Amino acid sequence: MGVYHGPDLKKITGGKKRRHRKVKRKYWMGRYPTNTTLAENEKRKIERVRGGNIKVRLRYAAYANVVDPNENVAKKVKILRVLETPANKELARHGIIVKGTKIETELGVAVVTSRPGQDGVINAVLIERK
């Protein structure tokens, strides 16, 4: 079941609008969010999207590619826990990782710079060393 992102059939005042076509279009459909969470094993889902392209969704994450700005070196490190999410505090409460989430890793606290539900990988920048 998809999510409908097409034009609404209600006016701001609450009245009904008339449809300008009889059927809904496929390009008006969306998808549900991935809600990437922590787990022991990573799991990715590959989907075909509009135009025949491929989107890799990261469903469960265990590791992140963390860049240390001082040394300018990237390392693959284990994620220990989700600290906070500026986008929505409920996401942090459920342990969901999105862009901008602060995560605790083996190196220290890092901020996620990639979109795990769109890219299929977690990239982060170290902001606080242990």
From Swiss-Prot:
Q: Which InterPro entries match?
A: Ribosomal_eS8, Ribosomal_protein_eS8_arc, Ribosomal_Se8/biogenesis_NSA2
| One GO BP | translation
Q: Which UniProt keywords apply?
A: Ribonucleoprotein, Ribosomal protein
**Residue ranges that the Swiss-Prot or TrEMBL entry lists as coiled coil:** none
Q: Name one GO cellular component term.
A: ribonucleoprotein complex
Record bears the keyword Ribosomal protein: yes
Q: What are this entry's molecular-function GO terms?
A: structural constituent of ribosome
Family affiliation: Belongs to the eukaryotic ribosomal protein eS8 family.
NCBIfam families xrefs: eS8
The record's subunit annotation is:
Part of the 30S ribosomal subunit.
Q: What is this protein called?
A: Small ribosomal subunit protein eS8
Q: Organism source for this protein?
A: Ignicoccus hospitalis (strain KIN4/I / DSM 18386 / JCM 14125)
Q: What is the lineage of its organism?
A: Archaea, Thermoproteota, Thermoprotei, Desulfurococcales, Desulfurococcaceae
